[in-house]
C-alpha cells in the first residue's frame, strides 16, 4: 500500500477514535501510526477497560485499497492518574511501556501500566 492509501487508512482510524470518545476527551495523533487519547473524569478503571475493548473491536477491520485487502488492529497502553503520576511525560512513558508489553505479547490488546514505585512517583509529582 502506498503512502496516500496509508494516510487514508490513518484518517479513518482518527475518525473512529474521535467518534468513540466523549467530546471532553482529547484525541490526537502522535505521529506514524500512534494516537493518544486523554480521558478526564474517569469513574473507575472498569470504564477505561470497557472503552479499550470497544475501541479494539472497532479497529479490527479489513480495508480494500488498490485492489488489496489490508487488515488493521490496535494495541493500547493505558496509564492512569495518580498511579503513574500526574505529569504528561510520566503518564506517556508509563503508557508507552504498557503498549510495548501488549506488542510483545502479540498485539491486538490493551494493558494498564504498572503503578510507579514510590521513588518514581515522588519524581513525577
Q: PLM features: residue spans?
A:
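A short, conserved beta-strand element in the Rossmann-like catalytic core
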Residues: 4, 70-71
